[in-house]
Swiss-Prot record:
Pfam families: Ribosomal_L10. NCBIfam families: PRK00099.1-1. The lineage of its organism: Bacteria, Pseudomonadati, Pseudomonadota, Gammaproteobacteria, Alteromonadales. Forms part of the ribosomal stalk, playing a central role in the interaction of the ribosome with GTP-bound translation factors. PANTHER family: 39S RIBOSOMAL PROTEIN L10, MITOCHONDRIAL. The gene is rplJ. It comes from the Bacteria. This is Large ribosomal subunit protein uL10. It comes from Idiomarina loihiensis (strain ATCC BAA-735 / DSM 15497 / L2-TR).
Amino acid sequence: MAIGLAGKKAIVKEVNDVASNALAVTVAEYRGIEVADMTALRKKAREQGIFVKVVRNTLAKRAFEGTQFDDMGDALKGPLVYGFSMDAPGASARLFKDFSKENKNLQVTALSIGNGIMGPEKLDAVASLPTRDEALAKLLATFKEPVSKFVKTVNEVPSKFVRTLAAIKDAK
């Protein structure tokens, strides 16, 4: 099915708009995946707020121009599906990693967080990045720990004094 020039321009604009607002992109080869499996991947992506699209590589290269993913051009070879993380940098990598466990035909070929392209060996590292809420929770726990230790230390001095007085009273 041939796409006309207007359709190609619309695809490039749509992908460019998404790429401009995305935190990260994960690119995977989907050769050999059945339609039902690809539909399941898209459904999971929608539930997680990840934009997934199959685009011709030449159109994707043009769509990435002027975005933070401009350097992805050399990695775009073969039938590829693109996953754009809009909320958490590791979301699309996590989705593709989990899906590739069930379906071995999905092979991550490249990923990018901002400027810089990474190979598939970095998939585990990117997929393990915390979400915004998880990162904030860890940060708050880090801030809270020294304060709680200080309060316990300050509280320990009077209670130790009271225990000493009680021991002296019991001794007499």
